[in-house]
Amino acid sequence: MRIKETLNLGKTAFPMRAGLPNREIDWQKGWADNNLYQQRQKLNEGKPSFVLHDGPPFANGNIHMGHALNKTSKDIIVRYKSMNGFRAPFVPGWDTHGLPIEQALAKKGIKRKEMSLVDYRKLCYDYAMEQVNTQRQDFKRLGISADWDNPYITLTADFEAEEIRVFGEMAKKGYIYKGKKPVYWSPSSESTLAEAEIEYKDIKSPSMYVAFNVVDGKDLLDADTKFIIWTTTPWTIPANLGIAVNPAFDYVQVLADGQKYVVAAERLNKMTDLLGWESVEILKTFKGADMELMTARHPLYDRESLVILGNHVTLETGTGLVHTAPGHGEDDYNAGTKYKLPVLSVVDSKGIMTEDAPGFEGVYYDKANPMVTEALEKNGSLLKLDFFTHSYPHDWRTKKPVIFRATAQWFASIDAFRDQILAQIEKVEFMPEWGKTRLYNMIRDRGDWVISRQRAWGVPLPIFYAEDGTEIITPETIERVAQLFAEHGSNVWFEWDAKDLLPAGFTHPGSPNGEFTKEKDIMDVWFDSGSSHQAVLAARDELTYPADLILEGSDQYRGWFNSSLITSVAVGEVSPYKAVISQGFVLDGNGRKMSKSLGNTILPEKIIKQMGADIVRLWVASVDASSDVKVTMENFQQVSEAYRKIRNTMRFMIANTTDFDPAKDTVDYAELGSVDKFMLVRLNAIIESCKAAYDAYDFATVYKTINMFLTNELSAFYLDFAKDVVYIDGQNDAPRRNMQTVFYAVAVALTKLLTPILPHTAEEIWSYLHEPEEFVQLAEMPEVAHFAGEEDLVATWNAFMGIRDDVLKALETARMDKVIGKSLEAAVTLYPNEANAALLASLDADVKQLLIVSQLTIADQAVEAPAEATQFDGVAVSVAHAEGDVCDRCRMIKTDVGSDDKFPMLCARCAAIVTANYPEAVAEGLEK
């Protein structure tokens, strides 16, 4: 019989190489075939609910790393909650209307103008659903557990119907109105934009100072005086109708190089330098309020501009006198409204100057800038022209600049319930905490929400018009449209005549002939997703309204967090969410946004194909996503290495429990050895820490806690010396069964704790354990156990670990000095102080075995440590080469090798084990 046959060398089919890219697909098929999501929901019936409401990603293209971070984070939370006492359904969603779909069709060569609107919208629908299905497969491949067969999609009939009802409820309460106001307008999209659809980029703009001649100075200013204004948008000068001043500021009339001007007193020195004035004399000082209703000659046209008061005027830039074009600026509009200034807009939907800008009509607004400048220079009104770089709003889809343009639009006003929204924000928990202040300030300061869009693909605004132009929005018309949308989808709005869309027999005093028309604009996509609290949370029996949690990127403070909060408080008088987690963006290694044009993208699909979805998921768990996250391929390599350690450690425990039946072989805690008890106490501390971290949505701490436990306490300590027990002792010997009890408990608990993060790997490990649940996802999270005397036990073993660290340092020194090679070649003598001597004497374990040395002597306190011993705090350590021969079975150097004549190659311990457990070896003898 060979010596190897007497060793309990763990054997397992659990592969060392993960092969995740292929093996994960098999697991996912098994989950689908066994309806695992539905099984988990059924198991959790009757438990307290926890609803994480999925903010809908836009359905366009394959998922990117930001999607992976977001959806995996949600999945980790939902999986944990589902295994920890909650009914936690997860309904995924998609945002499917809007300009990107139209742009995608245009790229495919589909021309909107060459077909009916209904046919075009059907193409948009088909394309959007293709994108939904693409992303659904991407998310499923990532291992996301969800109700994939019943997602919510903003283009479905049931969703659109509920969105109409949200709009109707807001209209009934008086929050919806039509007005002509300057709004963000994208000439490249030919549509209005909400604030959430704006991004800022640096551009170069003109900086221009223009003189307006005083016409009526109200007996304060002479007619030969000039007001000086500053602007960065020369093209809006044709739309100028006023000059705004701050009533509280001091202004001065000055004589500068022979010409009289008016500027703010505090800006005089700056203007003197800027305009190069050499001789400046202050003639008068007065308040801005004194200039109210003065008039000035427009520098280009034969009309007057009115001097008005406005608190928006500041002294940070410019002259303290603000060029006011009510059709092209929000502050201009608000200030001008008080003086009944007309709302004059001088560009059309494409950004082309109109006939309201004589001399510039037919010119693109940006091209009009130099033309306006030239005209002002010719008539002597241009005082100074420079150029500067500044941050300017752009269309987030087309990346082109936007302008302010007054058009007739539909708005949602929040003034009537702004305080109610702010009060609701105070009740919401935000992670990070600064999110509360950010959203609070946004709502406090935001203006009215422009909800109409001049596009084709979206939910129609359910508004009718009478023959006399009266707008018709009544509870009856809203409900009729909602029912029609629920039955036919929103295309019915474009397929049917207005009278057929109205309730049967509907009449209106403004339509004596019974004729009606319908609104052509569609709703802002943020109104779509912003209605999900009614269309999804309130509409589905398995969900709850409000949701317990939402989790999205930090850009959603001005997006979905904002729009859903407004609509929810408007119709339900409550925040749609109880807690908010915001995450940063995924950036490249240099902190740049990932984009195809920069060539710096890392796609989840690539990582999954190369390394597996569990590697992407482990990366998600390893990062602090509360701020922006930089990622490189090296990060995934590092995570892959950490994964390998997890896998190999779990494999070792599986391999060494193949002959362990937990039902028969588990040893009660009270009967375990001290070190085994210590490891179970530590395991329960790990369980407690991980569950607390999961509860706090702190996945990085879960990852670090498990990783440190596996690396420092299991691999580097317990499993390291355990080999001398589980391999060498007899199969049923108590020390071996003690250790197997610990191995198995650790394997089961860690597998459960890892399931939310590594579901594929956890299922693979679980299939090698002897647990009643077929899938670990159907098991419950481990409970935290506490044991009598555990605090003293931990204190004892922590103290021992300090001594062990000292011994390891001494062994390393001996290795470097060529005294020993491996630690098993060492004979160690310890010279402990009184406390450490008592500690070592109290241990019921073989200290030599714990230290993985062949020979150990603990000297009496009376014995003084030799000079060559390494001195530590509380113990001195002396290392020599062990005396004796190497046992061919346990590999220790012993002086009793050959003491049993039957086994001359074995030490006395191994000879006794073989004699007791392998009679054939006794009969036949042993060979190497």
From Swiss-Prot:
Q: Which cofactor does it need?
A: Zn(2+)
Motif 'KMSKS' region: which residue numbers? 593-597
Tell me one GO molecular function of this protein: ATP binding
Chain sites annotated for binding L-isoleucyl-5'-AMP: E552
Instruction: Kindly provide the name given to this protein in its UniProt entry.
Output: Isoleucine--tRNA ligase
Which GO terms are recorded in the biological process aspect for this UniProt protein?
isoleucyl-tRNA aminoacylation
According to the UniProt entry, where does the motif 'HIGH' region sit in this chain?
57-67
- Quickly give the catalysed reaction: tRNA(Ile) + L-isoleucine + ATP = L-isoleucyl-tRNA(Ile) + AMP + diphosphate
Matching entries from InterPro entries are given as:
aa-tRNA-synth_I_CS, aa-tRNA-synth_Ia, Anticodon_Ile_BEm, Ile-tRNA-ligase, Ile-tRNA-ligase_type1, Ile-tRNA_ligase, M/V/L/I-tRNA-synth_anticd-bd, Rossmann-like_a/b/a_fold
How it assembles, according to the record, is: Monomer.
Entry text on domains: IleRS has two distinct active sites: one for aminoacylation and one for editing. The misactivated valine is translocated from the active site to the editing site, which sterically excludes the correctly activated isoleucine. The single editing site contains two valyl binding pockets, one specific for each substrate (Val-AMP or Val-tRNA(Ile)).
Purpose? Catalyzes the attachment of isoleucine to tRNA(Ile). As IleRS can inadvertently accommodate and process structurally similar amino acids such as valine, to avoid such errors it has two additional distinct tRNA(Ile)-dependent editing activities. One activity is designated as 'pretransfer' editing and involves the hydrolysis of activated Val-AMP. The other activity is designated 'posttransfer' editing and involves deacylation of mischarged Val-tRNA(Ile).
Provide the E.C. number(s) assigned to this enzyme: 6.1.1.5
Q: Where in the cell?
A: Cytoplasm
Q: Name the species this protein comes from.
A: Latilactobacillus sakei subsp. sakei (strain 23K) (Lactobacillus sakei subsp. sakei)
Q: Where does Zn(2+) bind?
A: C887, C890, C907, C910
- Record GO cellular component, one term: cytosol
Q: Which family does it belong to?
A: Belongs to the class-I aminoacyl-tRNA synthetase family. IleS type 1 subfamily.
CDD domains, A to Z: Anticodon_Ia_Ile_BEm, IleRS_core
Q: Which of the seven top EC classes does this enzyme belong to?
A: ligase
Keyword annotations of the record: Aminoacyl-tRNA synthetase, ATP-binding, Cytoplasm, Ligase, Metal-binding, Nucleotide-binding, Protein biosynthesis, Zinc
Q: Write out the residues that bind ATP.
A: K596
Q: What is its main location?
A: cytoplasm
- Tell me how the cofactor is bound: Binds 1 zinc ion per subunit.
